[in-house]
Amino acid sequence: ETGESKETGESKETGESKETGESKETGESKETGESKETGESKETGESKETGESKETGESKETGESKETGESKETGESKETGESKETGESKETGESKETGESKETRIYEETKYNKITSEFRETENVKITEESKDREGNKVSGPYENSENSNVTSESEETKKLAEKEENEGEKLGENVNDGASENSEDPKKLTEQEENGTKESSEETKDDKPEENEKKADNKKKKK
């Protein structure tokens, strides 16, 4: 019915093998659609051995095109050794547009860079020297050394004055303390004085009592 051979499991009509799904006529595999003879894939049209694409004729590994011999990455042509982007030749290092050599251009660039860097440095110096002294006084610029020295000397004078005032203040404070210590009496002394006062008053009261007794005695005598 099927015309299929038992031994090989191969179909007569298609001549296709069951196991491999491979066609006799074309020797092409169903699954991969890859040809035995050329090892070329149907879908991509890409060859196994070279990894080269039919349509573009471009190699995978180098990314280089057959027709132009131009590399993808650098965009540089093999024959002329000329770069697409810059239009600059390898051998001479000369630019198409300007017809100017690299060496001179580089020299100009370095000169320009040098000038700008020097200018920046001097600016920075100015900025740093506009900072403050140790005493916290503002310093205006690098060329005003005389003024700066005056500033420092003034600050020293003010320092000395401040120190003098502090010393005087301390002396005054000491005097005040001395006076206080002289005038102020110790609490022990005060308590002793108070005790003495009470003793004196008690003695007075004792003295008062005999006087009263005497008076009483006089009265009694008078009555008698």
Curated annotation (Swiss-Prot):
Record keywords: Malaria, Repeat
Annotated region described as Disordered, given as residue ranges: 1-224
Sequence ranges of Basic and acidic residues compositional bias: 1-137, 156-173, 185-217
Region (17 X 6 AA tandem repeats of E-T-G-E-S-K): 1-102
Keyword Calcium included in the entry's annotation: no
Amino acid composition bias (Low complexity), ranges on this chain: 144-153
Residues that span the membrane, as ranges: none
Sequence repeats: 1-6, 7-12, 13-18, 19-24, 25-30, 31-36, 37-42, 43-48, 49-54, 55-60, 61-66, 67-72, 73-78, 79-84, 85-90, 91-96, 97-102
Lineage top rank: taxon: Eukaryota
Extra facts: This variable antigen is associated with the surface of erythrocytes infected with mature stages of plasmodium falciparum.
UniProt protein name: Processed variable antigen
Annotated organism of origin: Plasmodium falciparum
